[in-house]
Regions:
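Phosphate/dinucleotide-binding and metal-coordinating scaffold of catalytic cores
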Residues: 1-263
């Protein structure tokens, strides 16, 4: 078992990360991400909170998948979500610090990422292009991420949907996970419409770096100072996107006219 001190640090970092992502969604308002009213996509049925959902994974060699899991390498798999099968999706282990902690603890029940269109362009689950499965490592309540997302939604932050799922692999039970709508194309289209703007997921290269951009701080006009944001853009960057982002952070830093960049 990991020391309680490190467990506390990991939990704190998870909550901080959730609110940094919330801050990123706010800053993205200046890039054209304004919430819109739109018909609900069919895949939202998988995120209903009236029951624990079911997700079955079929992969040719599960042991081989676990062996390369630390490399976060995609393998081909078939998945069935509440009886709806999608064949030939991309499956990999997910996580950064959380994945390494799983390995250090000697476990193999990794968080998972399912990219429906990884091998076949346009493939989806009822319109959903990417799904994360949170193993809730070191969270026996399974509630920290779920509650953080619920708080974000309550505060009016555009928030990924989430639900609890029982996962099985090749017919064998693999445990309870939290399924989370990945903030990519389907997420952006659901909340911001077909003409959505840019979406970022700030992430540092090294924890020892200053990482001021991850904290959404304005550090000058040089786009290179915002590598941890621009590098993680979920869509292809267009001309002017970097300048728009920097302008939003400049305004947030000044504390004036914040309503111009925060929806």
């Amino acid at each position: 078992m990991l020391a309680r001190r490190w467990s506390t640090v990991v939990c704190a970092l998870a909550l901080v990360a959730a609110f940094l992502v919330a801050g990123a969604f706010y800053a993205a308002g200046a890039a054209g991400l304004i919430a819109v009213e739109k018909d609900e996509p069919a895949y939202l049925s998988f995120f209903s909170d009236d029951r624990v959902h079911e997700l079955e994974i079929s992969v040719e060699d599960w042991d081989a998948f676990l062996a390369v899991a630390p490399e976060e390498r995609y393998v081909r798999a078939d998945v069935t979500l509440d009886g709806h099968t999608v064949r030939g999706v991309g499956l990999r282990a997910k996580g950064n610090n959380s994945r390494r902690l799983v390995e250090q603890a000697g476990h193999v029940r990794y968080g998972l990422k399912i990219e429906f269109d990884h091998y076949e362009e346009g493939l989806s689950y009822l319109g959903l292009d990417k799904l994360s499965l949170d193993a809730s490592f070191q969270d026996n309540s399974y509630l920290k991420t779920y509650v953080a997302l619920d708080m974000m939604a309550f505060m009016g932050v555009p928030t990924p949907e989430a639900s609890f799922v029982q996962v099985s692999v090749n017919g064998q039970a693999w445990g309870l996970y939290l399924a989370v709508e990945d903030p990519e194309d389907a997420f952006a289209e659901r909340l911001f419409g077909d003409g959505h703007g840019m979406l970022y997921k700030p992430d540092y290269r090294r924890l020892s770096d200053e990482n001021a951009d991850v904290a959404l701080r304005y550090v000058g006009e040089d786009p290179a100072r915002y590598d941890n944001i621009l590098r993680t853009a979920r869509f292809d960057l267009a001309a002017g996107d970097a300048e728009e982002l920097i302008g939003a952070l400049r305004t947030l830093s000044s504390g004036e006219n914040i309503d111009e960049v925060v929806d």
